[in-house]
Each structure stands twice: as structure tokens, then as C-alpha cells.
């Protein structure tokens, strides 16, 4: 079983935890439809950066 050799000070403990913060996901708004989607992903109806890259199943 691992046992620490020296106690970690509150400062070092805080430095160790500094990378554990949660980040807000990058949400983008599609300019043509106004829908929200994750950045660098297509919107649910097939648009990416203002142009349609996938056709809808009803159109195909």
C-alpha cells in the first residue's frame, strides 16, 4: 500500500487541483437555422457554417 513520505502543503495541494476545473462546452449557433450545436459539429438538420453538408432523409 502506498504511503506518503511528506505531507503536501495546502499550496501544493491547490496547485495539484488547479487542472480539475470543469469547462463550459463550446456551443455555437447556426446562422441559417438558429439552432445550437457543439462547435466543429454539424447541426441536427445537416448544416455546418451556414451551408448544408448533409441532405435530410426526407429529401433523399
Swiss-Prot record:
GO terms for molecular function: structural constituent of ribosome. Pfam families: Ribosomal_L32p (PF01783). GO terms for cellular component: large ribosomal subunit. Keywords: Ribonucleoprotein, Ribosomal protein. One of its GO terms (biological process) is translation. Residues 9-19 have a biased composition (Basic residues). Residues 1-60 are annotated as: Disordered. The keyword Ribosomal protein applies. NCBIfam families: rpmF_bact. Belongs to the bacterial ribosomal protein bL32 family. PANTHER family: 50S RIBOSOMAL PROTEIN L32, LARGE RIBOSOMAL SUBUNIT PROTEIN BL32. This is Large ribosomal subunit protein bL32. The gene is rpmF.
Amino acid at each position: 500500500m502506498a504511503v506518503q513520505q511528506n505531507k503536501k502543503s495546502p499550496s501544493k495541494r491547490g496547485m495539484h487541483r488547479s487542472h480539475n476545473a470543469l469547462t463550459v462546452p463550446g456551443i455555437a449557433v447556426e446562422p441559417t437555422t438558429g439552432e445550437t450545436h457543439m462547435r466543429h459539429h454539424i447541426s441536427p438538420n445537416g448544416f455546418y457554417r451556414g451551408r448544408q453538408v448533409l441532405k435530410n432523409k426526407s429529401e433523399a
